[in-house]
């Protein structure tokens, strides 16, 4: 069925937005440190030793292009079924095809962030791109082409998507693609392509619809219950389907000690010290994003440390009150990301204005506004996006206030 092949692609996207697809890039850019008991998981990205035969590199490549194959198969299947559908069914399938065009653009952009040079408008016609399959041809051997051509294809697919995906979106944890989600992606894409005025405009157009969280309770619900007015697109996951997303257990690997009434941890990865220092005791994000004074045992060595707590998982997926599941509904787009896009874009246009959206985000999180002179070097916490932000000035200066 058309709904079936559509659903399969959504499952692929959930996998691409969880687990190692976040942690491996963060290892590469010194957000995380590898522990001695890791069994060498992630050690090559951590040491900046990237080889085409490395399992992390090959699994990323394979996952992105398997998803592309499923997207193109879905489009082909929908085209073949179209004449046999009722008019009402055809209207639905038109939307489904629009979703597939969007996901094709999104997946190729995500792959380009990892496998291509940073986009340079003056050099893109000569920079290597990636194969951009548009047909279901599993055995095809496509040329990489240029980065300029890749983003021409991305734009063409977005235009196709916008023809049929017209549902506006609401701040109610949308699980399927909306017009607002496309706008959010256009904001991120415009920033990457150095189209700063457009990036700012796209981002700002969503502010009025998706209110920022302003309390610790609201932020905790975002990560422990997967519900928030900030979610522009959050893919559906249930307790019965939570294995469709990858685990973040490597940040904690917790075990509950009932006789002591507390957790003990054996993490694979821990945050770098410069990340820990970004959080102050008065910051209401601290107890949500970090586990402080954690009892840690690594390869027989016991101590107390600070761990990543952001991905404890949705507590409604737990079968009891103490066994953490380390899985969440993937948040493809959130309004807080739009404030960061806007901040970066405005900074590029006029450094004096770059702090305006950043400070709106900071004050919503209960933090003091910053002056340009006291902006701290900061990063986005564990969203796997820092690797693509290495070339962005203000992303080197914003805290993961979202």
What are these regions (language model features)?
Residues 41-115, 145, 163-166, 323-330, ...:
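Conserved, well-structured interaction surfaces
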Residues 401-402:
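Conserved small/polar residues in nucleotide/adenosyl-binding loops
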Residues 4, 200-335, 367-376, 384-391:
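Hydrophobic-face positions in mid-chain alpha helices that act as interaction patches
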Residues 1-29:
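Acidic, glycine-rich segments characteristic of secretory precursors and extracytoplasmic regions
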Residues 21-36, 117-126, 167-250, 373-378:
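Short, surface-exposed recognition loops and adjoining beta-strand edges that mediate ligand/DNA contacts
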């Amino acid at each position: 069925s058309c709904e079936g092949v559509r659903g399969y692609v959504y499952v692929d996207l959930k996998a691409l937005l969880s687990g190692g697809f976040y942690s491996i890039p963060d290892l590469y850019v010194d957000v995380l440190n590898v522990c001695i008991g890791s069994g060498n998981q992630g050690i090559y990205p951590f040491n900046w030793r990237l080889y085409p035969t490395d399992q992390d590199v090959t699994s990323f490549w394979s996952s992105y292009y398997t998803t592309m194959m499923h997207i193109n198969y879905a489009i082909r299947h929908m085209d073949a079924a179209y004449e046999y559908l009722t008019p009402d069914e055809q209207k639905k399938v038109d939307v489904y095809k629009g979703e597939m065009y969007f996901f094709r653009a999104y997946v190729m952009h995500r792959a380009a962030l990892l496998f291509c040079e940073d986009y340079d408008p003056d050099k893109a016609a000569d920079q290597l791109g990636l194969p951009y399959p548009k047909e279901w041809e599993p055995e095809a051997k496509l040329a990489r082409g240029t980065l300029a051509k890749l983003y021409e294809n991305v734009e063409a697919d977005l235009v196709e998507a916008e023809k049929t995906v017209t549902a506006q979106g609401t701040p109610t944890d949308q699980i399927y693609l909306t017009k607002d989600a496309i706008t959010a992606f256009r904001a991120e894409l415009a920033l990457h392509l150095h189209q700063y005025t457009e990036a700012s405009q796209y981002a700002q157009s969503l502010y009025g619809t998706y209110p920022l969280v302003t309390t610790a309770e609201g932020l905790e619900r975002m990560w422990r219950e997967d519900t928030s007015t900030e979610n522009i697109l959050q893919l559906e996951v249930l307790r019965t389907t939570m294995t469709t997303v990858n685990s973040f257990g490597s940040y904690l690997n917790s075990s509950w000690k009932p006789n002591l009434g507390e957790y003990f941890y054996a993490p694979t990865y821990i945050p770098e010290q410069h990340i820990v220092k970004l959080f102050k005791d008065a910051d209401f994000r601290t107890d949500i994003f970090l586990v402080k004074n954690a009892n840690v045992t690594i390869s027989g060595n016991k101590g107390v440390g600070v761990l990543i707590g952001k991905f404890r998982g949705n507590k409604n997926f737990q079968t009891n009150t103490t066994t953490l599941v380390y899985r969440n509904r993937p948040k493809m787009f959130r309004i807080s990301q739009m404030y960061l896009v806007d901040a970066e874009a405005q900074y590029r246009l006029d450094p004096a204005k770059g702090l305006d959206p950043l400070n709106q985000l900071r004050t919503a999180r209960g933090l003091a506004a910053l002056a340009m002179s006291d902006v701290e070097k900061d990063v986005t916490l564990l969203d796997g996006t820092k690797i693509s932000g290495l070339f962005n000035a203000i992303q080197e200066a914003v805290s993961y206030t979202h």
